[in-house]
Amino acid sequence: MSDEGPGTGPGNGLGQKEDSSGPEGSGGSGPQRRGGDNHGRGRGRGRGRGGGRPGAPGGSGSGPRHRDGVRRPQKRPSCIGCKGAHGGTGSGAGAGGAGAGGAGAGGGAGAGGGAGGAGGAGGAGAGGGAGAGGGAGGAGGAGAGGGAGAGGGAGGAGAGGGAGGAGGAGAGGGAGAGGGAGGAGAGGGAGGAGGAGAGGGAGAGGAGGAGGAGAGGAGAGGGAGGAGGAGAGGAGAGGAGAGGAGAGGAGGAGAGGAGGAGAGGAGGAGAGEEAGGAGAGGGAGGAGAGGAGGAGAGGAGGAGAGGAGGAGAGGGAGAGGAGAGGGGRGRGGSGGRGRGGSGGRGRGGSGGRRGRGRERARGRSRERARGRGRGRGEKRPRSPSSQSSSSGSPPRRPPPGRRPFFHPVGDADYFEYLQEGGPDGEPDVPPGAIEQGPTDDPGEGPSTGPRGQGDGGRRKKGGWFGKHRGQGGSNPKFENIAEGLRVLLARSHVERTTEEGNWVAGVFVYGGSKTSLYNLRRGIALAVPQCRITPLSRLPFGMAPGPGPQPGPLRESIVCYFMVFLQTHIFAEVLKDAIKDLVMTKPAPTCNIKVTVCSFDDGVDLPPWFPPMVEGAAAEGDDGDDGDEGGDGDEGEEGQE
């Protein structure tokens, strides 16, 4: 069928002319059915499996390629599944002889899919033959509207296989899927970075191929995906050269359009095959440039063979991305906790357990708000894996079609704030729980949270605290806060208690955000056993700026506060300063916490507390008796102290 034939001729284009020519299809130099070009490209004629252009050397995908020599029936609309590649997406490209060239492996690359319908772009050539310098697979041409060229084939393993060309970016389509790995030849060049898809989804920037194991150059870091979803920049694995170790290229950050953040590639640790140079510390993962940026995962510093691993730079805070701070698990680039740049242990692993990348920008409020409005106890699923499916979150929102319009159903993001306590979208779940990683002790976590799941029903609706109101235990998170305070308090040793034990002084703490206050409150409780702290509550509104109407006296704002009762004024001052100093070093909501000292002329008579009986007989006692005591109603003035 002449080379030029439209390829619809009787032959199903499967290379029938050469089919038999040998399992590799090496036969077909020359004509080799041009038919292919429309194979998976939109027009469904299942013609040639292979996008070969007229003389494309291998007619890409020629020959039986299904090793059994059997031709498959002609119309094979899908490119998937055939054993042999037949080009649909050009997968089989290159089976044919390379022009006149090496048999078998060395097929030429399918010269990209024609600019025809959105077809599979030309397949990547399977790299040059193992000859001295097999050419690199040509870059897959970009399908005009179509899929992107699957990146250049891997360069042949020849003496210096060229690098696979970068995948062309699909003009409107998917992105080029990254350059092939450079051949393992003497000095395989680095695979070119995958081109970013121009529009549409961004290319996952190709990981730069690992440099050949020869004098390998480091793989160039994957290019950043262009706008669109951000491509995760591939981390170039440095070639383990005989000589210097390639420093892993830092993964390019996906330039987030509105994209998710590119996870900064972890810099590869230079391997240093012979312990050549020490691997330069892994480059820090590039920050995800924020669109609604996710947190760039701080690159794990590679352990160089001597050079200290570079610290993963914290993912840059995108607009709303989490990043902040260097790796490690603390407040570092590790888990984006979301909400404006405060990185952090959040839900944990790199960018991980917590926002599950989904919409990390307000990850906390969103995805989790959903989780909660959902009415099933599971605010963050305990196990990372469960998230996507079990949490039901994504799937479970849509089904009830337009529901959001009728009325704020818990799940609908729009109504987050109704559910979740205020425009800043923090769920009303215990703020403690909010950003805690899976808490270690149920001491306070939402009693219904994941950990409650086993307990049948919710024990009592959400208790921010575990056992009795307000007996929160300790756990690593609050311990850290407490530790910070203890250090600051250690600066001055002053009396914290008095003989009379009257609560005459106080520290009034407010502002920041509910969550930051809650955490600080739990921290103070651990650091200063001598104090007594009220639950978190809300401030009323103050004055309206203009002459207009003023708020009612009872009108609550969403700004929270709590009061710390103390027995000495001097310690109140010390504690105030400590809190101020602790808070100012922290990121956003926290640094806005304000503190002021109060003094109570006659002291506040806090109701007496009788420790519960040991046998547990009267374990309710502590509640019980202060109830009977009548105390709490009227501050228990009946002769407390």
From Swiss-Prot:
Biased composition (Acidic residues): 620-641
Keyword set includes Ribonucleoprotein: no
Positions marked as site (Required for episome maintenance): 518
Location of region: Nuclear localization signal: 379-386
Family membership: Belongs to the herpesviridae EBNA1 family.
Oligomer status and interactors: Homodimer. Dimers can assemble into higher-order oligomers like a homohexamer. Binding to the DS element involves 2 dimers of EBNA1. Interacts with human USP7; this interaction is independent and simultaneous to EBNA1 interaction with CSNK2B as well as necessary for PML nuclear bodies disruption by EBNA1. Interacts with host CSNK2B (via KSSR motif); the interaction requires phosphorylation of EBNA1, is independent and simultaneous to EBNA1 interaction with USP7 as well as necessary for PML nuclear bodies disruption by EBNA1. EBNA1, USP7 and CSNK2B form a ternary complex.
Domain notes per entry: The N-terminus contains the region UR1 that binds zinc and is essential for EBNA1 to activate transcription. This domain dimerizes upon coordinating. The Gly-Gly-Ala repeat region (GAr) inhibits the mRNA translation of EBNA1 in cis and thus prevents MHC-I restricted presentation of EBNA1 epitopes to the host cytotoxic T cells. The chromosome-tethering regions contain Gly-Arg (GR) repeats that function as AT hooks and are involved in EBNA1 stable replication and partition of episomes. The C-terminus DNA binding and dimerization domain (DBD/DD) is required for the viral latent DNA replication.
Name used for this protein in its record: Epstein-Barr nuclear antigen 1
Natural source organism: Epstein-Barr virus (strain GD1) (HHV-4)
Gene: EBNA1
